[in-house]
């Protein structure tokens, strides 16, 4: 078993978000050709529902899902789903970059709609995992923790760097 886990399905780093690859418990590579958060949510939901018999339904389980998006560069529909981008594409920059310290004329500001679309898509994918817990009758006896490894400055403080800075926007999650 991979790292002592009965079930392992791991993101294979440095992928395009709509063309990711993964490694499973047996070391098999998977290339699903779909936006990674939606794929990962489906895999997690299948595990929760025990669709493939990967866990003992009478025993508690631990499931960790680490989605890569939202992750820079947020430049195109390759980084998000069209339905999520549609929520933001026509909004003026002042409605997207609402922090008082946002510098709205930075080059990075052009990526704001793609960034927020990616965030919305991750929210939707996470909702699918929560729905699977509810459908499986596990919500009363399950602890769910949502966390992130860093924030995003998104033009705040006048920096292009999303995370490698000492600012609250990049450190708070």
Predicted regions and their residues:
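Short, structured coil segments at secondary-structure junctions
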Residues: 3-4
